[in-house]
A protein has these predicted regions:
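Tubulin/FtsZ superfamily GTPase core signature
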Residues: 1-179
Length: 179
């Protein structure tokens, strides 16, 4: 995993270099998880971010780019700049952690690295979302929430593959996970 905030010097400059080295020297699955700058950070930073993402995309099997500006849709108008950046960092962490948990957590239907590799190897742009549900309609609510995620700026339409992970309590019934 290569996680970075794009638009500045460090993440934008280092992430493509690290990805290139990983691709050229190993058979690793290279997954980029990055954030794009908030609008208030300016056009120059946005342009630098887009150029960095374009370069990073050349060296990643899969790239998930999250626009920080979309965070304004889900957070309080009174959020401080510091907390907005903290929230952006948390989105990166959740993205990486969720993919890692698919591999490391044993479930009713076991998925492993081979499954993740099959979906993410040479996949290009990625779309990832999480949904939560509770109560009688928890399964429908979780799916709806995941599909309507305001943080994503690309569509699931035209996807080449899907990695779908369901996590529930010990009371999860098979009727909620059967097609």
């Amino acid at each position: 995993f290569i996680a970075a905030g794009m638009g500045g010097g460090t993440g934008t400059g280092a992430a493509p270099v690290v990805a290139k080295i990983a691709k050229e020297t190993t058979d690793a699955l290279v997954v980029g998880v990055v954030t794009k700058p908030f609008e208030f950070e300016g056009n120059r930073r946005a342009k630098v971010a887009e150029e960095g993402i374009k370069e990073l995309r050349k060296h990643c099997d899969t790239l998930l780019a999250i626009p920080n500006e979309r965070l304004t849709v889900i957070c309080d108008e009174e959020i401080t700049t510091e907390n907005a950046f903290r929230m952006a960092d948390d989105v990166l962490r959740i993205g990486v952690q969720s993919i890692a948990e698919v591999v490391t957590t044993t479930g009713e239907i076991n998925t492993d690295f081979a499954d993740v590799n099959a979906i993410m190897r040479n996949a290009g742009p990625a779309w990832m979302s999480i949904g939560y549900g509770a109560g009688e309609d928890r399964a429908k609510d979780a799916v709806r929430q995941a599909l309507e995620n305001p943080l994503l700026d690309i569509s699931i339409e035209g996807a080449k593959g899907v990695l779908f992970n369901i996590v529930g309590g010990t009371d999860l019934k098979s009727v909620f996970i059967s097609p």
